[in-house]
């Protein structure tokens, strides 16, 4: 007989589970209060009895720490229960092991495990548990999962999916598929939020393989626009935190994201899944930190903006050269040249009677070649002085030691990173490929190679990071990946889409990243879930991706509207905004080619409640947003308006990239506007 066979039985069971959860939450509240009261009593006792003996203090200290630990555990339990009381579970499979006399077990799957200590049964299984993987990977029939004891084989006889909101079951679907299309369509048709949401209820089989991949030391995810790659990467982090709890925690992970707006947009996913937020940084922050924040530099955003507004052949040539594997090979040869030619040993008169010969000092420089060059001075000094002590039986003073170290350091001509970097271009006979901007400002493309040289000379591995997640992988150059590999010799998840590069002269494909990191398993996501079929089809005309498979969710055809002049175009955009405001949509993105165009549009529209997001913004907001295509990467909106799509504004390859990014932000409705006689040739 099937457990909870009818929908009526399922609704009744759901209410039982919610009542039990609320009962346990109530008990934990009492327990938390008891621990707080006990700690307050200890505090009062210690305050009132200042003369108690050390043994009693020690005993009380242990009791206080014990109450703290138990109290924190109870609070953590309450937090997890509170997360599932509104939506206890979203799926169910009935599974029977193949071995004899095993009953059919109903397995309800939710965001967290709920083990009822009273009945000693697991009522809800965490979506990350090994047994839960069958919900995503199998249809009805034979199935298996990997348990700590090995592979467990069996049969799935029933599969259900539920939509539960605020403790009420909206509907239930019998499903023979991995994730039923009706459920997926309903989720995809929903409106965009101000934060990215978890997708545990609709994870697809190919996405699940990426999330649960434990073997790959470096996993490179190439996913088409709207394939959910960022969300999948975050669910992968949540899975790894669950699977390896005890050996890795949230603070051991680092996310490299493109900007603070995007970092804020994705900040809700891990807490929704019951994990702590993960540290986040940007590529340029990390590179600048390696260089001890010594140099002013053009940001990546400023580089892209210059390429969009006033590109010059020389600037493009410098970027392309520094993004090539030939450049990396040349840098490596130059580092060997430094090793062999930059240390010029000299005799050092240590005392009136003792001189350290140049040959001996030179020998020690190469003896300690396991260290980065600048790290050798300390070891060389200690070794030389130890040898002097053996030979001359004397002990040097601190002043003599410091003098020797200073002299050894002076013999090395590579103590200034920037000078060494300039030397490289002279050595290559290409001095024109290095250019400092006004106020001694470095170009963005010089930041990574300068950091690469610094690490070769100084060292700088960051072993505190156990897993590195790099998003928008296509916008980073091979030399940047080389720096990341040297800085973070840990496991990595790298994700992006080669079709969405805003850095066409310095971008990387999955194969290039694999080559730069010397390792990496590439997994691909072809299905696009974000946009309607019509919007995806329109985007394909701008940049064809033969691998992309659109989900069959239909909607309005994108509109391209022509106007006689800018005034008419602006008036039409205001009407489109009014139509949006009267609709059920929650978010509208007005996406311009550049930040200056976006700022100008915001000024001209003069509509209340419009949010202009710049490269300096730090939070994503719901509602009407005016933003550049570069800043919009990774975000999504119910509706998108793209102004000024004339042939003068969108004509170069980088313009095509920006237009593709802008178009693929739209979920349900897309309108492009322009004034003049011709629209961009890309549409």
Regions from the PLM with identified roles:
Residues 241-468, 475-483, 491:
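Alpha-helical nucleic-acid-binding subdomain
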Residues 246, 260-276, 281-286, 292-300, ...:
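Conserved helicase motor core of SF1/SF2 NTP-dependent helicases
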Residues 1-36, 40, 184-303, 633, ...:
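P-loop NTPase Walker
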Residues 85, 91-93, 99-104, 453, ...:
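Domain-scale macromolecular recognition modules
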Residues 189, 193, 321, 370, ...:
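Conserved phosphate/pyrophosphate-binding and hydrolysis machinery centered on Walker-type P-loop NTPases
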Residues 92, 209, 218, 252-254, ...:
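Beta-sheet entry/capping signal
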Residues 54-73, 211-217, 222-224, 228-231, ...:
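Generic detector of solvent-exposed, compositionally biased contiguous segments
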Residues 1-200, 204, 208-212, 680:
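Extended, charged low-complexity regulatory segments
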């Amino acid at each position: 007989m099937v457990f909870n066979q009818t929908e009526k039985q399922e609704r009744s069971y759901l209410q039982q589970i919610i009542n039990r959860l609320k009962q346990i939450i109530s008990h934990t509240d009492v327990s938390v209060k008891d621990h707080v009261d006990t700690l307050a009593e200890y505090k009062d006792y210690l305050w009132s009895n200042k003369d108690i003996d050390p043994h009693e203090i020690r005993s009380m200290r242990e009791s206080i720490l014990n109450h703290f630990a138990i109290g924190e555990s109870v609070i953590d339990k309450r937090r997890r229960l509170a997360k599932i009381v509104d939506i206890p579970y979203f799926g169910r499979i009935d599974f029977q092991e193949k071995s004899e006399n095993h009953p059919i077990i109903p397995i309800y799957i939710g965001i967290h495990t709920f083990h009822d200590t009273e009945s000693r049964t697991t009522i809800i299984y965490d979506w990350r548990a090994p047994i839960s993987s069958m919900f995503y990977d199998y249809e009805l029939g034979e199935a298996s999962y990997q348990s700590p004891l090995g592979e467990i084989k069996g049969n799935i006889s029933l599969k259900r999916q539920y939509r539960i909101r605020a403790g009420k079951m909206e509907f239930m679907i019998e499903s023979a598929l991995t994730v039923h299309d009706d459920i997926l369509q309903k989720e995809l048709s929903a409106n965009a939020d101000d934060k990215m949401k978890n997708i545990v209820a609709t994870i697809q089989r190919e996405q699940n393989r990426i999330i649960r991949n434990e073997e790959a030391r470096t996993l490179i995810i190439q996913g088409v626009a709207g394939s959910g790659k960022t969300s999948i990467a975050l669910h992968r982090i949540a899975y790894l935190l669950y699977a390896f709890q005890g050996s890795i925690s949230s603070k051991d992970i680092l996310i490299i994201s493109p900007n603070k707006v995007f970092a804020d947009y994705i900040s809700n996913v891990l807490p929704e899944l019951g994990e702590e937020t993960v540290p986040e940084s940007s590529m340029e922050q990390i590179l600048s930190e390696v260089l001890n924040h010594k140099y002013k530099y053009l940001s990546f955003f400023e580089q892209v903006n210059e390429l969009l507004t006033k590109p010059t052949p020389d600037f493009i040539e410098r970027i392309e050269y520094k993004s090539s594997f030939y450049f990396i090979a040349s840098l490596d040869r130059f580092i060997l040249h430094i090793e062999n030619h930059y240390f010029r040993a000299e005799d050092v008169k240590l005392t009136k009677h003792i001189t350290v010969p140049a040959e001996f000092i030179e020998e020690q420089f190469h003896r300690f070649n396991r260290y980065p060059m600048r790290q050798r001075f300390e070891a060389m000094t200690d070794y030389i002085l130890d040898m002097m002590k053996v030979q001359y039986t004397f002990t040097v003073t601190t002043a003599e030691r410091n003098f020797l170290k200073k002299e050894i350091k002076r013999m090395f001509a590579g103590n200034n990173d920037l000078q060494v970097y300039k030397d490289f271009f002279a050595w290559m006979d290409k001095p024109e490929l290095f250019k400092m901007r006004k106020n001694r400002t470095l170009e963005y493309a010089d930041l990574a190679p300068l950091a690469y040289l610094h690490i070769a000379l100084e060292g700088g591995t960051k072993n505190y990071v156990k897993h590195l997640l790099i998003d928008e992988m296509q916008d980073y150059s091979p030399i940047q990946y080389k720096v990341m590999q040297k800085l973070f010799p840990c496991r990595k998840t790298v994700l992006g889409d080669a079709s969405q590069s805003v850095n066409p002269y310095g971008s990387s494909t999955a194969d290039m990243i694999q080559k730069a990191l010397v390792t990496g398993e590439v997994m691909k996501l072809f299905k696009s879930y974000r946009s309607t079929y019509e919007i995806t089809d329109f985007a394909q005309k701008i940049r064809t991706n033969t691998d992309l498979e659109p989900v069959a969710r239909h909607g309005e055809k994108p509109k391209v509207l022509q106007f006689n002049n800018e005034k008419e175009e602006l008036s039409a955009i205001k009407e489109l905004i009014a139509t949006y405001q009267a609709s059920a949509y929650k978010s509208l993105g007005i996406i311009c080619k550049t930040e200056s165009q976006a700022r100008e549009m915001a000024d001209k529209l003069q509509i209340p409640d419009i949010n202009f997001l710049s490269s300096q913004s730090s939070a994503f907001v719901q509602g009407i947003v005016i933003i550049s295509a570069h800043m919009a990467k990774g975000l999504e909106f119910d509706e998108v308006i793209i102004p000024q799509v004339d042939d003068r504004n969108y004509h170069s390859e980088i313009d095509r990239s920006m237009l593709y990014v802008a178009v693929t932000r739209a979920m349900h409705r897309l309108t492009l506007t322009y004034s003049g006689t011709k629209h961009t040739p890309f549409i």
